[in-house]
Amino acid sequence: MASVDGDSRHLLSEVEHEVSPGPMNIQFDSSDLRSKRPFYIEPTNIVNVNDVIQRVSDHAAAMNKRIHYYSRLTTPADKALIAPDHVVPAPEECYVYSPLGSAYKLKSYTEGYGKNTSLVTIFMIWNTMMGTSILSIPWGIKQAGFTTGMCVIVLMGLLTLYCCYRVVKSRSTISTSDTSTWEYPDVCKHYFGSFGQWSSLLFSLVSLIGAMIVYWVLMSNFLFNTGKFIFNFIHHINDTDTVLSTNNSNPVICPNAGSGGRPDNSSMIFYNNNTEVQLFEKWWDKSRTVPFYLIGLLLPLLNFKSPSFFSKFNILGTVSVLYLIFVVTLKAVRLGFHLEFHWFVPTEFFVPEIRAQFPQLMGVLTLAFFIHNCIITLLKNNKNQENNVRDLCIAYMLVTLTYLYIGILVFASFPSPPLPKDCIEQNFLDNFPSSDILSFIARIFLLFQMMTVYPLLGYLARVQLLGHIFGDIYPSIFHVLILNLVIVGAGVTMACFYPNIGGIIRYSGAACGLAFVFIYPSLIYIISLHQEERLTWPKLVFHVIIIILGLANLIAQFFM
């Protein structure tokens, strides 16, 4: 075996000194070298931020083979046969491989486990939680009642925050193993064995596939309304004449009035004597045709081996949420507030403040506040680890305020009379006609953003399912195609027969939240306290109540 001095030779030829570290330099903890696994990179693919070409020596290639030899001796989680220090390259010689085929230089640091400031960490958590659920918050408030809805949002925010805090602290309860590289499924496996690992995988897939189904329903909705806007604009058709709506310069519609809550796609029934309109209605239907048009566009994107290209558009999610906040604020200013308070008895135009359907809002909020399966990963990159709990609390507070802001403004400004509050749709954008310019822009933003996120969700589902079953995230094009056809088929089926995003969100939220939000964090905490002989009756009762609440939340969704 080569000596330590011999192995300390430079693996890469001398390179031009970097004036600025640049945004692509990835930081890591220099004390954690034993967990690094370098990759052999083709010489033409070794790049720096300033594109200085570097060469890989034969010595580096040989060392790479040694590393792979050690990695085959045992499982990655087992530290017993990890590669010794003299085989692992020095910090300045470590590179991380990008799926795009490039290697980016790692920069050592000593300030923390990551490079993100608290402000960046807070924004990342907020941005990750801001999803499609925000479109259903006003509908959830309508189902619960205005006062009850606000209280439920605050209480669910506090409850999910506490459970998320328990997830963050779960690794520190394990003293027998090095948990620095663990994710939450690893913690579940430690406490519950293979059942914990596979059940966490199952519920994670439920949340992923549920989100993909909601995305397909919404993309069908947005594509339908976009096409309808263009057709109506060309043919000078006013679609507010065919539905119950307000007669002013800021029209609000009740598209499902008299349909028992079922989606109504015949929005131009008064123009059926026009052959052109009849043809358009036949081939441009929200439930019968548009969901199938998306297949030709999105199915090929799901089969990409790497979704790296689509990750470049993540900023669109933030832009979409900020634009929604702007639209809601502007609409509220123009429409004004329309509120009456009746505690238990509904009226013609207003719902009572307390309604028995409040569990529907709880189901929506379980998914709206759901970040428990990836919060450990997000906080690992925080520069100051001692601020993790504080940053998590601030992020949850901002998310709660965002949901309250959107929900209260949409509900309060909904024009009642002449329209009843029960007209608030599961996607509140459906309460604005397709001819509304602000809503049209919002739908375009959201449609494009969802079309870039959808392949990322499909990739995550592929990694979790095929990676666990076959040990390879891309075993063959046949395996990947079958999985994608099943996922797309589920989305098309729901878009055709159950295009109710509020219902889909609350069911999937209550299901995945049962494990990740309510049961696992509480049960792991109870077990750890029992092992340390610190378990008390108040703590036991409190966390058992949380588990029971999660079960009740799921069961209640089937009776609403």
UniProtKB/Swiss-Prot annotation:
Motif (CARC motif): 443-453
All ranges on the Lumenal side of the membrane: 140-145, 225-282, 334-355, 415-436, 500-506
Positions carrying Phosphoserine: S20
Pfam families assigned: Aa_trans
Membrane topology recorded in Swiss-Prot or TrEMBL: Multi-pass membrane protein
Recorded coiled-coil stretches: none
Catalyzed reactions per annotation: L-leucine(in) = L-leucine(out); L-tyrosine(in) = L-tyrosine(out); L-glutamine(out) = L-glutamine(in); L-asparagine(out) = L-asparagine(in)
Segment forming the signal sequence: none
Stated role: Lysosomal amino acid transporter involved in the activation of mTORC1 in response to amino acid levels. Probably acts as an amino acid sensor of the Rag GTPases and Ragulator complexes, 2 complexes involved in amino acid sensing and activation of mTORC1, a signaling complex promoting cell growth in response to growth factors, energy levels, and amino acids. Following activation by amino acids, the Ragulator and Rag GTPases function as a scaffold recruiting mTORC1 to lysosomes where it is in turn activated.
Protein's name according to its UniProt entry: Neutral amino acid transporter 9
Species of origin: Mus musculus
Gene that produces this protein: Slc38a9
